[in-house]
Every structure is written in C-alpha cells, then in structure tokens.
Amino acid sequence: MLKHQNYLASITLGLGILWITPAMAIEEPKYEVVTADAQFEVRHYAPILIAETIVEGDMDAASSKGFRLIADFIFGNNQQADSDKKAKIAMTAPVTVEPQSSKIAMTAPVTVEPQAEETSMKTAKTWRINFVMPSQYTLANIPKPKNNAVTLREVPSKYFIVHKYSGFNTVSRVQTKTDETVEWAIKRSYKMIGAPQLSRYDPPWTLPMFRRNEIMLEIAAP
C-alpha cells in the first residue's frame, strides 16, 4: 500500500519567490520505498495530478520562468471547474479575498525535466516544469488555467530511482548527481524510462547542508 506522505513548514521551492507563510503545511506526493541504498531509493509513486508548462532557456532561467507561470495559475489566474462564475476558494491561510479566481494549496516539490530527448542538464534548452496538485483535486473538479501555457495532466502510478542530496544546485552539480543516478541504475540492471528530473523542496534561505534535492529517474516496474 502506498503510505508515505511528508509535510514541510514553508517553501518557495528554491526559485526566489516567497509564497507560503511559515505556518503553512505543504503536501507531498504519496509513495512507498521499495529499496533503499544509502542516498538512493527506489520509490513507487501513487497516481498524481500535475500542472505543467514547457519553457525554453538554461536550467535556471527555465526553472524561474516555469515556476512563475504555474504559480500565477495556483494563486488565482484560473476558472472554477464547477461554475461559470469566477469566485475565490479559501484553501490556505491566511485568506486573501480576490474575486474571479480560486486559490489552490501548494504542494512540494517543483520538478524540472529536460525535453526533446535531451538528458543533459548542462545542454538542454527546453524543459518541462511541473507542480503536483493537492490530492483532493481531480481533472473534473480542479480550477482550470486561464493561461494556455499551463496545462493539467493525470500521471499514473510510476516507479522512480531517487538520488537524495543537499547543497546548492549548480548546473554542473546537478549533472554530476544525474550521472551518479544513471550509473547506479545501470549497475543494478534497472530499465530506465525517459529523461531525469530535478526536484527541489526548500526556500532559498535554507542553509545548504539542510536543503533537500532529488534527482528522479523513471524506471520500469522492478
């Protein structure tokens, strides 16, 4: 049974935008740890609903642009799914009333994935940025983005190799951690699927040794 669920006290996801008060709990995707080996885990994730956008640029520029686009959707640039009228839905605290929009609770992490068959964090120029939506939502009841650059998508249950590490996320360091993840997978004969992903959990003021970063690499069911 999928049983793991963590909560963080506050987050800006390392991209320099303040958005959650320290008292706010952040929901994370549910998963079960299948195998653990030092800084590596094989996880089985439950199905999720994500908001995503495709952006161009280097890793840092694309992360910032994609974050802002999806944050704009989450914080009000949306249309309620069950009504032609636009109305504020108070899902977080403190509540700020804005007509004609719905506010969606935040989750962690934000995920960055190179696109167009590109697996190098150093050379990729097109990226998929996504946020996992709170678990009470489905495609039927979640507010819909007004910006066509942001789309909603259901992601089925999947397996990932996850490489956990702390510190800063320079492009070179992320590539090194990605290479280590691929090497770990190859040595254990896992079948890799798609491009690696970088997931970040912490606000920018978090001390480097306390930052939580993860390289995620999808694999076939072990």
Please state what every model-predicted region is.
Residues 2-10, 14-222:
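A solvent-exposed interaction/effector surface
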